[in-house]
A protein has these predicted regions:
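Conserved "HGTGT" condensation-loop signature of ketosynthase/thiolase-family condensing enzymes
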Residues: 1-112, 117-134, 167-264
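Active-site-proximal alpha-helical scaffold in enzymes
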Residues: 62-67, 72, 137-163
């Protein structure tokens, strides 16, 4: 595979101790200390009240990161192709459905069943934005962020149109947590453009690599990177926060990983 090249027009990030890209950028550049805290999400005011009442953390997280990336770029969310990438989707919802099925009353809530499909966030996004552009939902276990980045990049390059990547993960409650130990919710949004614009803050050149993934210097951030699939993005986000030129390797399938050259 030859290198793929796109430009980053917008960034969104909500995770533990990083409520939005502005605060996250300060943490990632060392201007502010990283303090572990539960992710704080804004209300999803773009959804009608009935839908707003039905959504859980996963959809709120996807909405928050997507809208922040679009705002950062000054882009119209209603016009953007999207890629939603999540290793487990709505884990709380999955837990509740399984709990119901294990009980004497096995009647699953229609709303919970509706929200259990992997592309539910894409559906709520279309309701919130009125977007009728193409949307893809995928997962790839621990390689989910890299798989989403590749998919969004290929779509941007092949269509000649911007593509918004929304990668997010949430935590399973026990007993499922014992089998899939994602400790915190985290979401990342990247608006990728095949053309350099006034909104572009960096350019990415992406290609396969046999090199090992770039670790985070901060032990607490490295712990997040290793334990949350969406946090495999942190070395790239840190490079973007610092500005200038540099390269990182992010986890993909191990052989290969993805090498990313970042330039202004």
């Amino acid at each position: 595979m030859s290198a793929l090249r796109v430009h980053v027009d917008g960034i969104g990030l909500f995770g533990p101790g990083m409520a939005g890209w502005t605060l996250a950028r300060e943490v990632l550049t060392g201007q502010a200390p990283f303090e572990l805290a539960t992710v704080q999400l804004p209300p999803v005011n773009a959804l009608p009240p009935a839908e707003r009442r039905r959504v859980g953390v996963a959809i709120k997280l996807a909405m928050a990161t997507g809208f922040e990336a679009a705002r950062h770029a000054g882009a119209d969310a209603a016009q953007l192709n999207t890629v939603f990438s999540s290793t487990g989707g709505d884990c709380d919802n999955c837990h509740n459905i399984l709990e119901t099925l294990a009980s004497s009353d096995r009647a699953v809530s229609p709303t919970r069943f509706h929200n259990s499909v992997h592309n539910a966030p894409a559906g709520y996004w279309s309701i919130a934005t009125g977007c009728m552009a193409a949307s893809t939902s995928l997962c790839a276990f621990d390689a989910t962020f890299a798989a989403g980045l590749l998919e969004a990049t290929v779509q941007a390059v092949s269509t000649g149109q911007p593509c918004l990547l929304i990668a997010f993960d949430t935590a399973y409650p026990e007993p499922l947590y014992a089998l899939r130990q994602i400790p915190y919710a985290m979401g990342v949004g990247l608006l990728l453009n095949p053309h350099k614009t006034a909104a572009s803050c960096a350019s990415l050149s992406i290609e396969p690599s046999s090199a090992v993934a770039t670790p985070m210097d901060d032990p607490a951030l490295e712990d997040l990177r290793q334990r949350i699939p969406a946090a495999r993005s942190l070395p790239l986000l840190q490079r973007l926060a610092r500005g200038g030129t540099g390269s990182v390797v992010i986890d993909y399938l191990g052989a290969p990983n993805l090498a990313i050259e970042v330039t202004p």
